[in-house]
Amino acid sequence: MSAEILNPNLRRVVLASNNAGKLREFSALFAPLGIELVPQSELGVSEAEEPHATFVENALAKARHASRHTGLPALADDSGLCVVALGGAPGVHSARYAQQPGGARSDAANNALLVRELAAAGDRRAWYVALLALVRTENDPCPLIGEGLWHGEIVDAPAGEHGFGYDPHFYLPQQGCTAAQLAPEHKNRISHRAQALAQLLDKLRATGPVDRP
C-alpha cells in the first residue's frame, strides 16, 4: 500500500518532546503518512515551560516553542492521566506528579504515589487525555488540534512490559488487560494518542492538499 503523503511542507516535523516513549509511539503512527518526526533534542531545542492549567494551552506553548527555534512545523503533545477519585489529578502534572523540587522525573515514583493516593478509594475510574497541537509556523493563526480520551481503571498491581508512564496500572476492562500488556501495534490503534492523531489528521486533510502517489 502506498503511503499517504500530506502537504510536502509537512514531510519533516519537529516533535516538541524529549520523551523517548512518545517518540516511539508517534514515529510509528506517522511513518505510514510519509512524515519524518525529528525530536527537538536533535535540533538543540530545550524543553518548553508548561505553566498552563489545561492540556491544550501547554501543547500549543510547546509546539510554538519548537517551531520558533527550528523554523520547522512542530507537533506537540500534552497528555496525562485524570483520576475520578482525585478530582482529575494528576492531570497536567502527570509527568511530574511525584517530582521533588530540583529532582528528576520518574515513572516509578509517579506510579507509587498514585497507588498510595488511591489506597482508600473505592472508585478507580480514570481516563487518559491526549491533546495534539500542530503548527506550521511559530505564529500559525490556525493551529490544528486533536483530542483523544481513553477510559479505564487504576489497579494497584502493575502488569505488562510495554508502554510507559502509568500504563502498567491503567486497566482496560474491554481488553481485559492493562495498557502495558497491549502489543504496541494494538495500543497504537486504540490509545488516546491514536484517537487524537486521527482527529488531527482529519482536520489536516480538510485544510490542506493531500497527494497520493
From Swiss-Prot:
Keywords: Hydrolase, Magnesium, Metal-binding, Nucleotide metabolism, Nucleotide-binding. Gene3D superfamilies: 3.90.950.10. The active site is at 78 (proton acceptor). GO terms for cellular component: cytosol. One of its GO terms (molecular function) is ITP diphosphatase activity. SUPFAM superfamilies: ITPase-like. Its cofactor is Mg(2+). Substrate binds at residues 17-22, 79, 164-167, 187, 192-193. It catalyses: XTP + H2O = XMP + diphosphate + H(+); dITP + H2O = dIMP + diphosphate + H(+); ITP + H2O = IMP + diphosphate + H(+). It holds the Pfam family Ham1p_like. Binds 1 Mg(2+) ion per subunit. One of its GO terms (biological process) is purine nucleoside triphosphate catabolic process. InterPro entries: dITP/XTP_pyrophosphatase, ITPase-like_fam, RdgB/HAM1. The keyword RNA-binding does not apply. Its EC number is 3.6.1.66. Belongs to the HAM1 NTPase family. Pyrophosphatase that catalyzes the hydrolysis of nucleoside triphosphates to their monophosphate derivatives, with a high preference for the non-canonical purine nucleotides XTP (xanthosine triphosphate), dITP (deoxyinosine triphosphate) and ITP. Seems to function as a house-cleaning enzyme that removes non-canonical purine nucleotides from the nucleotide pool, thus preventing their incorporation into DNA/RNA and avoiding chromosomal lesions. This is dITP/XTP pyrophosphatase. It comes from Bordetella pertussis (strain Tohama I / ATCC BAA-589 / NCTC 13251).
